[in-house]
Amino acid sequence: MYRLEDTNSGGVMDKNKQKLSAYGSSGGSVDAAQGSGSGGGRQRHAPLYGRFVDAEDLPATHRDVMHHHSSPSSSSEVRAMQARIPNHFREPASGPLRKLSVDLIKTYKHINEVYYAKKKRRAQQTQGDDDSSNKKERKLYNDGYDDDNHDYIIKNGEKFLDRYEIDSLIGKGSFGQVVKAYDHEEQCHVAIKIIKNKKPFLNQAQIEVKLLEMMNRADAENKYYIVKLKRHFMWRNHLCLVFELLSYNLYDLLRNTNFRGVSLNLTRKFAQQLCTALLFLSTPELNIIHCDLKPENILLCNPKRSAIKIVDFGSSCQLGQRIYHYIQSRFYRSPEVLLGIQYDLAIDMWSLGCILVEMHTGEPLFSGCNEVDQMNKIVEVLGMPPKYLLDQAHKTRKFFDKIVADGSYVLKKNQNGRKYKPPGSRKLHDILGVETGGPGGRRLDEPGHSVSDYLKFKDLILRMLDFDPKTRVTPYYALQHNFFKRTADEATNTSGAGATANAGAGGSGSSGAGGSSGGGVGGGLGASNSSSGAVSSSSAAAPTAATAAATAAGSSGSGSSVGGGSSAAQQQQAMPLPLPLPLPLPPLAGPGGASDGQCHGLLMHSVAANAMNNFSALSLQSNAHPPPSLANSHHSTNSLGSLNHISPGSTGCHNNNSNSSNNNTRHSRLYGSNMVNMVGHHNSGSSNNHNSISYPHAMECDPPQMPPPPPNGHGRMRVPAIMQLQPNSYAPNSVPYYGNMSSSSVAAAAAAAAAAASHLMMTDSSVISASAAGGGQGGGNPGQNPVTPSAAAFLFPSQPAGTLYGTALGSLSDLPLPMPLPMSVPLQLPPSSSSSVSSGSASVGSGGVGVGVVGQRRHITGPAAQVGISQSVGSGSSGSATGASSSDASSSSPMVGVCVQQNPVVIH
């Protein structure tokens, strides 16, 4: 066997030798013919792996191929080889090099056209097959009504509930789709939000429905810029929410400006409406956090108007029911959410600050591509966050490194190569173009864009963009900022009969001349500032010249005369308060209304005094603290703090961190010189010493007050319940008042509180006044003319006006009244058979300062004086007096929120 293999292998080797010798001889002849002299017929070849080889060294197959090509056997092979050589060449313009370089776009366009043409032909050829094959698959998704993304398949012209005819698709999102539809019952177009047919989306949409229904009940008159939910229903396993149809959103508006931004005036109108909406959301009955405030979620009501509404509460929650940690769109995400600190309603204020800058500049203020980039861009503008915030945040190490030596923090080194400016070096001053004519200098010399306007805007934005949510400006304070201060030539209120936009609406034919800081109050509301205030009063008969002269110059007592019924003669006797009133009084609704001169002791001795104290300091610091809360102040023995909730919403916000009881005792007696001392004190810091409270810039407009709670009885809170108010509640809780109260004045106080509350919210007007009434302070014997039982003719109000900010107005029976209030000199009224209180709307303009309550007219017994209470602030020479004792003095004054027209101005 082995021998056979050797024999065979030897035979193969012999054959190879024969071939090799034949190849060598033929090679030698070729070389001889060519005269190459190859030396013994050996042929040299190109180096193989670095050395020259002979033909013998090549494998047999290589030698055969080489021999075949080196000696063509026939002319046919030669011709075939020649045919393969090109005799013409391609034009360079049409060559592949040009097509794939210079003409690359044209090449790909051609490729796309060819591809989609083939795809279309293929789809047309197999359409019937596809329809039949997809039917089974589509039935897997809600019987064919849904696509594979669990969205409802929209068909134009389809009717939901045989009522809503689908018009078109408006938009899509992670939640589902929004379609425009026609409501055949109400004959109007609506927007229907169709939620995905998935359990998580359905659950969140049900929370949205609950929150929207709460807000719509609290905003029955549709004044607080929240989208109106008409109804909701289930349709083929999809929850459908029917909304009013609005226009395009603020991002679309920016895009229409080519991202150059809108004017500062229009930005102000947007800001005012949004602050009012946030103030509404912050009421204790709601405490709703939007959690996704951005330009896309703010829609214009009309494309030619500035009225807006907030939409998309799909991510929203209430303060005590936070369920998400990853919230807010990145550009508008607050530092506490980025850092992982517990958040509250203040995150919406941060978003609002970012939105306002973007609306004016046209570009996002902080446009991070991820959270780390976002934090770096925030630090570029605002500097480093406070150390105490970073110490308590559990995501600090994601953004910052801690220096061991001193415990301070520095930004982490960037891993992606981006370079950032040093902390705080990209100034908001430069971004807004405060001194350079606005962003990019585009607003240079444009009216309403002065350096002063920009400085106010910048100051407001910096307060909104405070790192610490506890010191970030609240909506209530923001609305009182100087940025919203109206000028005499710009009116943004709309008012009906009996009220004007720029002049104070008088109550009953009263008029007064007031200075720019004016404290003039019509009809029984003593001026707090005799140097500039003017008081006018009219009785049932025409006032005499002496009365007019007396009221034009006099003020009542120590300047805290609030309420009705004070006569000109009494005001003439009082000592004027020698302190100026630099800012307008907060909205006070003084219904007036006792039967004799003792009526000035009905409620609070120091309402006007507190108002002056609270508003006389133009606080510029960001941590201006609100007034003390009832939770702390009602324990003071001499302050009667437990009655604070008689006048909710008067002058400020409650502060859950304050301890006011330790300083209230010094204000127990406020008449005479003590009141001057009280007004003279101001607190410029952030301590709990609340005998003096500093406020931010106050706008010359009444801040919006909240609507009454829903009539379900939940609003009647006793004092212990009031102590449970949530922290950072933005709306003012009450105005503290001080002094002692007699048993007779208790009934009078209850009566006046009832009257004030009954005027608090009128359904025929959108002017919302905080109810507060006060007693005039003057020098005299506090024992004359005690309150007659007829003062109790003002019965306690019914529940609809009984509460505000979670504070009971409807009952004084639960309130401890430790000491009697000292009565000052009674106010003598001209004799007559009856007295009527006619009230106008509180408005802001160019007269004195005063207060009005909208709507009702009450008859009381005793001496007659038609008491008109008006409010106007400004620098004009006279306040407008309208109404003339009419029961509908301001029955149709639809002020939309605060200082925003019902029919807003045209966008420019």
From Swiss-Prot:
Q: Which SMART domains does the record cross-reference, listed alphabetically?
A: S_TKc (SM00220)
SUPFAM superfamilies the UniProt entry points to: Protein kinase-like (PK-like)
Where does it mainly reside? nucleus
Extent of Low complexity compositional bias: 567-576, 655-664, 868-893
For the motif Bipartite nuclear localization signal, give the residue ranges: 121-139
One Gene Ontology cellular component annotation? terminal bouton
**What tissues has this protein been observed in?**
In ventral nerve cord and supraesophageal ganglion of embryos. Is most prominent in the mushroom body neuropil and the outer proliferation center of the optic lobes in third instar larvae.
Residue sites binding ATP per the record: 170-178, 193, 243-246
Which keywords accompany this UniProt record?
Answer: ATP-binding, Developmental protein, Differentiation, Kinase, Neurogenesis, Nucleotide-binding, Nucleus, Serine/threonine-protein kinase, Transferase
Span of domain Protein kinase: 164-484
Q: Where in the cell is it found?
A: Nucleus
Biased composition annotated in UniProt, kind: Polar residues: 623-654
Region: Disordered; residue ranges are 1-46, 119-143, 552-592, 623-669, 863-895
User: What is the catalytic activity of this protein?
Assistant: L-seryl-[protein] + ATP = O-phospho-L-seryl-[protein] + ADP + H(+); L-threonyl-[protein] + ATP = O-phospho-L-threonyl-[protein] + ADP + H(+); L-tyrosyl-[protein] + ATP = O-phospho-L-tyrosyl-[protein] + ADP + H(+)
Q: Where is the active site?
A: 292 (proton acceptor)
Under Gene Ontology molecular function, one entry of this record is: ATP binding
Q: What happens when the gene is disrupted?
A: Flies exhibit a specific and marked size reduction of the optic lobes and central brain hemispheres but no major alteration in neuronal architecture can be found.
Compositional bias segments (type: Basic and acidic residues): 132-141
Family label? Belongs to the protein kinase superfamily. CMGC Ser/Thr protein kinase family. MNB/DYRK subfamily.
What this protein is reported to do is described as: Role in the specific control of proper proliferation of optic lobe neuronal progeny.
Q: What is this protein called?
A: Serine/threonine-protein kinase minibrain
Origin organism of this chain?
Drosophila melanogaster (Fruit fly)
* Gene giving rise to this polypeptide: mnb
